[in-house]
Curated annotation (Swiss-Prot):
Protein family (similarity comment): Belongs to the Ycf3 family.
Gene, per the UniProt record: ycf3
GO biological process: photosynthesis
Compartmental location: Cellular thylakoid membrane
Signal peptide start and end residues: none
Gene3D superfamilies per UniProt: Tetratricopeptide repeat domain
A single Gene Ontology CC term: plasma membrane-derived thylakoid membrane
Species this chain originates from: Prochlorococcus marinus (strain NATL2A)
The protein's name: Photosystem I assembly protein Ycf3
Matches recorded under PANTHER family: CELLULOSE SYNTHASE OPERON PROTEIN C, TPR REPEAT-CONTAINING PROTEIN MJ0263
The UniProt record lists the keyword Coiled coil: no
Length: 173
């Protein structure tokens, strides 16, 4: 997987080199180091908008990574790519896998809720209120969890939960 050398951002380039150097001298085994380097390359590719290359690097990282928190972070980034590409079902499934590895990722829950809420709005526009309610209830369920994990971090979501009457009182405490 050759990484293109088209980075324009000096700070990103410097940080990447610095991180690679630090990883090489860290007292961790070579498998963990390699997993992290693949992750960093995937992140750089994702930031450059090269999603297919990013996914390849993330897949390689997952093959080597044993740490559940790190696996969850990698899966979350993959789900973000799927979501950006409009592959919502794959994004949801990957967010669920990420949460299975590390359940304390409120951004996964937030993004799943965005997909559910969007589907609810589409059903509403099409005049299907029952389907709309199902999607909105799913959005409320994951968003309530996100707000509990990150209080005050998603004020727009807290507002949606309040205004739609779908939030529990304990969410705001």
């Amino acid at each position: 997987m050759p990484r293109s050398q088209n980075k324009d951002n000096f700070l990103d380039k410097a940080f990447t080199k610095m991180a690679e150097g630090i990883v090489k001298v860290m007292p961790i085994d070579s498998k963990e180091k390699e997993a992290y380097l693949y992750y960093r390359k995937g992140l750089a590719a994702q930031n450059d908008g090269d999603y297919s290359e990013a996914l390849e690097y993330y897949e390689e990282s997952l093959k080597l990574e044993d740490n559940q928190v790190d696996r969850g972070e990698t899966l979350k980034n993959m789900a973000i790519i799927y979501m950006s590409n409009g592959d919502e079902e794959r994004a949801i499934n990957t967010y669920k896998k990420a949460l299975g590895q590390n359940p304390k990722q409120p951004s996964c829950l937030k993004n799943m809720g965005l997909i559910y809420e969007k589907r609810g709005r589409m059903a509403q526009r099409n005049g299907n209120q029952d389907e709309c309610d199902i999607w909105f209830d799913q959005a409320a369920e994951v968003w309530s969890k996100a707000v509990r994990l990150y209080p005050g971090g998603y004020l727009d979501i807290e507002n949606w939960l309040k205004t739609t009457g779908r939030g529990n009182v304990d969410v705001y405490l």
